[in-house]
Amino acid sequence: YRLVGSEMCIRDSHNISQPKLNVNKLSVKKHINEDGSYPNLDSNVTKEKTLEIFQGIYPEPKFLPGGDKYLLIEFGNVMNLELNFKAQGLSNLIKTANIKGVYETLPCFASMIVHYNPDDIGYQDLINELKSLLKDMKDNDDTVVNSRLFHFPTVYLDKWTKEAIEDYIAKITMKKPDPEFITELNQLDDVNHFVRVHSGTEYWVASLGFWPGLPFTMPLDPRCKLTAPKYNPPRTWTPKGTVGMGGSSTAIYPDRLPGGYQIFGRTPVPIWDPDKNFDVFKDSICLFKPGDRIKFVPCDYDEFEMIEKKVEDKSYRYDLIEEHKFSIKKYKNWLSKIDYNKKF
């Protein structure tokens, strides 16, 4: 049910139409300040653009059956931070409420799945319980969460994902190489432009996916929002540490796995560790948790190999920025001030 739940929850992010990207050579060096605010950027765009980003939020959540043991809750039809806060907030309330018959919650970008036992609680009774909890949720704008920022060295346009793509083309079906396909689809200048855009923002970890530790993320800077469909059919293998995207979500593959995301980079940094060889895994075998942030930092093959050796001898130290207080209100304020005419 974990795989089914993850796929059902993430579907809303894979069919989002994207406006034409208008980005140029701009590198956003600063991200979040220590007090949780975002750096000021010159702007001639204010409230109207911010409201556009946060459209698509339903006045009331939609409750839909997912077979006889699952309930799907949809909070909207777009991928944005506010909807993820709603999903995470309700998930936390359900855990503390100890509702009889509820086994697990699977929050994602704009929706969540509740796994329950229909012998203990009926479908409509569960909906009534959840509606009651929703009334107790405070306004998202007042929510502040602890958020860790990880810097992940990444080789973009790398030889490993290129090999996987070429193997797929040779054995499965013809397709344009993934970086070129994403570049063309998003009307970017060239693959180097694509790399600048993708690496120009922090990514919000909205949920963990179909494999232990795999993060489903969304870009915090809307100017870096790209889109790409998943493979059809999927690949039979993907290199460990691959960075890829499907819909507008970016993910990191924790291991050598089948996969359907468009792929374009690779990181040597482990994101799950069953043996807990590194201190960051002392509380969990999975590195990330919802609310974390990832910054992909372009690196070359020499740096990749150096980090890989440190990982092998267990001397690698994660590039982790200590937790900050992340505020939706301050994030919205930052959105209202950025210049959407500037390009990466």
Model-derived regions, located:
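Single conserved hydrophobic/aromatic residue that forms the stacking wall/gate
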Residues: 1-12
